[in-house]
From Swiss-Prot:
This is Beta-glucuronidase. InterPro entries: Beta-gal/glucu_dom_sf, Galactose-bd-like_sf, Glyco_hydro_2, Glyco_hydro_2_AS, Glyco_hydro_2_cat, Glyco_hydro_2_CS, Glyco_hydro_2_Ig-like, Glyco_hydro_2_N. The active site is at 408 (proton donor), 501 (nucleophile). D-glucuronate binds at residues 160, 407, 462, 468, 501, 546, 565. The N-K motif seems to be a discriminant that could be employed as a fingerprint to identify beta-glucuronidases from the large GH2 family of proteins. The keyword Hydrolase applies. It is an enzyme of class 3 (hydrolase). Belongs to the glycosyl hydrolase 2 family. SUPFAM superfamilies: (Trans)glycosidases (SSF51445), beta-Galactosidase/glucuronidase domain (SSF49303), Galactose-binding domain-like (SSF49785).
Length: 599
């Protein structure tokens, strides 16, 4: 899906700002009362003073009367949503015009043509934040009958982050040609000497056109190639490299009877990805991933788009010598992906497939029992849709170097292989760049119990030795994690290993002479132990800390106003360990052939 840009043939109007708002039922044929308002884009939760409203589950409404811009007879009007979490129904003047399920990918709805001559239209958005065993993420949904006979809806999350909800990303009103560019796919093949590239363009239009013209510009806006065919050869190319991004721009124009119908510009980078011999190669050089699992999570905004925080986070990431992040545990905003492209940051791109086990307590149970997860889950349709929409959205981003099919599912239980095999294949069939696919493995899915890692290209592990296992005992933890990593390497000698989560909750300012858990001293010792092990595993090609910053969670005995595993506090202030990471990561090259340095 194309990002909403202003071009010669397209107008975009930002509908963000203050909207009328209501939790609960509403008839869209009536006006929504204006006694309560809400911001778009943002999460509604943390703007609520009332705890009951903050934790509300069910339908909630946004409504606004907007001016109708001029629309010519050969144009159409579209409402384009960056995301609505988790379900949405869109009404224009009380009439349902579109709906979408899935809270982290964009969608659009056409405004009926009969409304184009109206002076104003009323846009109503019915959003819903219910999660159950058919949705991604997964939640345990229940209904409680209150004393007054009313029904209270409740979701017990199968995941360890707060169920923020709302119109989280930009809402645009677009005026575009009826005959328009629907999608653009760009692929490339680099020459043996990496000095030139063959480009292929697939331009999809919603109507037949006579001609497609493609012009490619470099970063100085100099024309470097043009074609009326689907192919183009570029010489003396600049590669997209780690923290040294180079973006070309493809201007696509479509014509009928020599008349311009639509124009759109898509950025792209030239780079090559390969997984081979236990290494992850970018432009034929081995990469070492240094970075983080993150969350879209800030004060007041919740999960709503915060572009200032995005930029601050990537500035802090680069300052530490890091080069990557994972979009844990859902697709991040299009704005963040475009920023990563521009800054040369590697992205491991994840669908919202989190909570794929019986319940959250089951995820903490390290015993080998089978909880019957794959007989319980009804998420297949939602999972397929999430993969399709993510690949459609992110396929051209050079920053995206790997797809994630799920985070910490019950991959050790019977039925896991049958569930994931077609989903991994779906990724590979859909992705025009044929990126590697991985699954982020849960702690109890050890090499002898896991049933799915044979399906994926890279072994990604979330491991908490010294925290959830051998809590506070770093001596035993070091023995345990080294033993398991060597077992994974022996089982899959040709697959690289990335630690996608490791960490320890740490309260800023809490100290101890004896380095006990939750102190800043223990966090430093925890990571020192972990890195000592990582450095001795030849196939281990990356370390992504859990987490970049502290973040909000649902209520549980393990959480004191959120998860505190961040290297930074929630307001992005560094903990003591940040300087230790900076020392380490500044000495590890981004391109690092580890097999040459590990004996």
């Amino acid at each position: 899906m194309l990002y909403p840009l202003l071009t010669k043939t397209r107008n975009t109007y930002d509908l963000g700002g203050i909207w009328n708002f209501k939790l609960g039922e509403h008839n869209p044929n009536e006006l929504l009362p204006s006694d309560e308002v809400m911001v778009i884009p943002t999460s509604f939760n943390d703007l609520m003073v009332s705890k009951e409203k903050r934790d509300y589950i069910g339908d909630f409404w946004y409504e606004k009367v907007i001016e109708v811009p001029k629309v010519s007879e050969d144009e159409e009007m579209v409402l384009r949503f960056g995301s609505v979490t988790h379900q949405a129904k869109i009404y224009v003047d009380g009439v349902l015009v579109g709906e979408h399920k899935g809270g982290f990918t964009p969608f659009e709805v056409l405004v009926p043509e009969c409304k184009y001559n109206n002076e104003k239209i009323k846009v109503s958005i019915c959003a819903n934040n219910v999660l159950d065993y058919t949705t991604l993420p997964v939640g345990n949904y229940s209904e409680i009958i209150q004393e007054d006979g009313s029904i209270k809806k409740k979701v017990r999350e199968n995941f360890d982050f707060f169920n923020y909800a709302g119109v989280h990303r930009p809402l645009k009103l677009m005026i575009r040609p009826k005959n328009h560019i629907f999608d653009i796919t760009i692929t490339s093949r680099l020459s043996d000497d990496l000095q030139s590239a063959d480009l292929h363009f697939l331009v999809e239009t919603n109507q037949k056109v006579d001609e497609v013209r493609i012009s490619v510009f470099d970063e100085d806006n100099k024309l470097v190639g043009e074609t009326k065919d689907s192919r183009l050869f570029l010489s003396d190319v600049h590669l997209w490299e780690v923290l040294n991004a180079y973006l070309y721009t493809a201007r696509v124009e479509i014509f009928v009877d020599n008349q311009l119908q639509d124009v759109y510009e898509e950025n792209f980078g030239l780079r090559e990805i390969e997984v081979t011999n236990g290494q992850f190669l970018l432009n034929r050089k081995p990469i070492y991933f240094k970075g983080f699992g993150k969350h879209e999570d800030t004060f007041i905004n919740g999960r709503g788009l915060n572009e200032a925080a995005n930029l601050m986070d990537l500035n802090l990431l680069k300052d530490m010598g890091a080069n990557s992040f994972r979009t844990s545990h859902y697709p991040y905003s299009e704005e963040m992906m475009r920023l990563a492209d521009r800054m040369g940051v590697l992205v491991i791109d994840e669908v919202p497939a989190v909570g794929l086990f019986q319940n959250f307590n089951a995820s903490l149970d390290l015993s080998p029992k089978d909880n019957g997860t794959w007989n319980l889950m009804q998420t297949k349709a939602a999972h397929e849709q999430a993969i399709q929409e993510l690949v459609k959205r992110d396929k051209n981003h050079p920053s995206v170097v790997m797809w994630v099919v799920a985070n910490e599912p019950a991959s050790h239980e019977a039925g896991a292989h049958d569930y994931f095999e077609p989903l991994v294949k779906l990724y590979k069939d859909l992705d025009p760049q044929k990126r590697p696919v991985t699954l982020v493995n849960i702690l109890m899915a050890t090499p002898d119990r896991d049933q799915v890692m044979d399906l994926v290209d890279v072994v990604c592990l979330n491991r908490y030795y010294g925290w959830y296992v051998d809590h506070g005992d770093l001596t035993n933890a070091e023995v345990g994690i080294r033993k398991e990593l060597l077992e994974w390497q022996d089982k899959f000698p040709d697959k690289p290993i990335i630690i996608t989560e490791y960490g320890a909750d740490t309260l800023p300012g809490l100290h101890s002479t004896w380095n006990i858990p939750y102190t800043e001293e223990f966090q430093c010792d925890f990571y020192e132990m972990s890195h000592r092990v990582f450095d001795g595993i030849p196939n281990l090609v990356g370390e992504q800390v859990w987490n970049f910053a502290d973040f909000e969670t649902n209520l549980m005995i393990l959480r004191v106003q959120g998860n505190h595993k961040g290297l930074f506090s929630r307001n992005r202030q560094p903990k003591q360990v940040v300087k230790e990471f900076k020392k380490r990561w500044m000495t590890i090259p981004h391109y690092h052939n580890k097999k040459n340095s590990v004996k």
